[in-house]
C-alpha cells in the first residue's frame, strides 16, 4: 500500500464546502468517488484544510492510500470539470496534510473607492502572533484561536483590491472576517485603533461577520519535506479550464457593466 499527496484546484461555486458530507456535493465526496472508480475502495482521504461553500482552491493538498500508482491525469479522468488534480508526490506513512508549514489565501474585493493606504496600515498589524477570537466562528469552548501570520499584503489592481495572507494555520472564517474589517477601514467607517482592538480580544470583544465566500481562494499549502511533481498534461488541463472561466465570467462582467452604463440595470 502506497500513500500519495496531490495538489488539487477547484471552483467552489457548486460545492457545499470541501469536507465530506453524505447528503451534499462536496470536494472530498467527488474525490472519494473518483478514487473508487479507479479501484481504490478505502482511500482514507485527508485534506490540508476545510474550505466553506463557495470558496475556491488552487493549491489544496489531499492525501490518500492506494495499492497502485495513481497520477493526477488518471484522477482527472474520473473527476468533474470543477476539480482538477495537477501535481503529486509519494509520501511517507506519517505524512499528514494538516501538518503544513503554512497556508496562503488570496481574497479579491471589487471596487476602487477604498482608502488603500489605510488598508495597508491595518494589514501590517496582522503580522506576528495574535489571538483571532474576534475573527472566527469558535470550533469549541476553550479552543485556542492564537495563530501566527507570516506575511500579509494588499494592493489595488484596476477595479479590484487584492489581499494576500500567509499563516501557519487559520481558524474557521478567519480570512473572510479579516477582509470584512479591512473593508470597513478602507471605506473609512472604522479606524486603525478599532482594528488593533480586535486583535486584543481579552480587552475588546466584537464579532466580525465574514465577507462573501466567492472572493476567497486557497492559493497554496506549503511543506518543508514534500516536493510535488507537476503532471504537465494535468496542469495544461487546469490552465484550459481556468481560461474557460475567465472568458465566461469576463464576458458576463462586461455585459452587466454595459447594462449599468445604459441604465438597464
From Swiss-Prot:
Pfam families xref list: PseudoU_synth_1
Protein's UniProt name = tRNA pseudouridine synthase A
Quote the catalytic activity from the record. uridine(38/39/40) in tRNA = pseudouridine(38/39/40) in tRNA
Tell me which PANTHER family the record gives.
PSEUDOURIDYLATE SYNTHASE, TRNA PSEUDOURIDINE SYNTHASE-LIKE 1
Question: Taxonomy-wise, where does this protein's organism fall, top ranks first?
Answer: Archaea, Methanobacteriati, Methanobacteriota, Archaeoglobi, Archaeoglobales
Which top-rank group of organisms is this from?
Answer: Archaea
The EC code for this enzyme is 5.4.99.12
Q: What does this protein do?
A: Formation of pseudouridine at positions 38, 39 and 40 in the anticodon stem and loop of transfer RNAs.
> Active site at which residues?
52 (nucleophile)
Query: GO molecular function of the protein, one example?
Result: tRNA pseudouridine(38-40) synthase activity
Which GO biological process entries does UniProt record here? Answer: tRNA pseudouridine synthesis
